Structure formats: C-alpha cells, structure tokens
C-alpha cells in the first residue's frame, strides 16, 4: 500500500480504495474530452480494477478531492499489435489482468487541468515504479496518446507526426513528458484508440525497473 505526502505535503498520493471509484470516474471524464464515450471508464470499471489488482490503482488527493488517478494491470510483454480496448479487456481488465504477469501495463492516467504543471503525473509514474519494484516486475509499459497531433492534423498524417516525433523534431504534450519521466520508445500503435485528435494513435513505451534492461537483449 502506498500512502505518502507529496509536493510539500499539499497532496496525498496513495493506493486507491473502493470509495475512490466515483472520483476516478470524474478525473477520467474531465481529462479525456475527445475520447469516444465507449472508451471512457466509469466507476464500475474502476471498482473492478481495485478489486482485481488493488496495488496497481493509484490516486492523488487534495482537500478530500481526487485530482489525479492511474490505472494498471499485470500482464506479459505484448508481442502482438493490439488496441486500447483489447489491452484492458474492454475497460474491465478481468481477462487482461494476469496475476503472475511480469509487466505492469499502465492503461490510464489523468490529472485534473487545474492541478497540472506541478509534476503530479511524474509522481504517479514514480509510485508505479515503486509498485513494480515491490512486486518484482520487469517494467511498466504504456501506450501514450499522441495528444499534440490535433494541432497539426491539417498539415501532416499521423504516420508522419509519429515519425517526426520519434526523431525529436518537436515535442508532444503527453509523449515528451513520459520520455522525460524515464520511458523508452518502442513503436507507434496506429488505430490503437478512438480519439481523432490523437490521430487514433499512441506510442508504445516502457520504463524498466533495471535501467540496464533493454527490450531485445
């Protein structure tokens, strides 16, 4: 269980409890306004995540309000192409979560807009890293949404955007902070998610517990 004060004690980062599901639902709906409704998680989904893998569900709280949340499951390294809905068993994780899996798949993270820019997402990644270490897992794996594509979608394809992003020709408001937090690029995942502003794409990345570990070794 994680329960720690962060940012000079003004926020609490902790393992999610059953009573947090409604607050997590609010964070989800607020943070992903362009995501198709069929891919938005609700309190019932979050309740199931907490029931199945409580250690992997985290929240950030301030003055009694949930202002950030992160959802994960355990799995084996995904060798094949997959979609967001496939990765999390249509949001429920019941069949996707493998209790003996050696990777942590982070399939959701959000921080309310008025609390962004303070490093809360980085704190959540650090906490997930702590959970990975405690459970003896290999790494976190995520599919970061290419949020920045929406601003340039009239000037380039999503494929070109990902190629240029991978060459560090520009930054992305989601992918760049994730890389700065320690994640390593694997590959773009096209048609991964139903979000036109992201070009329906995400970047598959991993953050190993042992920094000497590299995929393909």
Predicted segments with their positions:
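A short beta-loop-alpha structural element at the N-terminal edge
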Residues: 11-24
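Helix-loop element at the rim of GNAT/NAT acetyltransferase active sites that forms part
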Residues: 15, 26-41, 49, 212
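Conserved acyl-donor/pantetheine-binding loop and adjacent beta-alpha core of acyl/acetyltransferases
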Residues: 70-108, 126, 142, 146-173, ...
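Short acidic/polar active-site loop segments enriched in Thr and Asp
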Residues: 138, 184
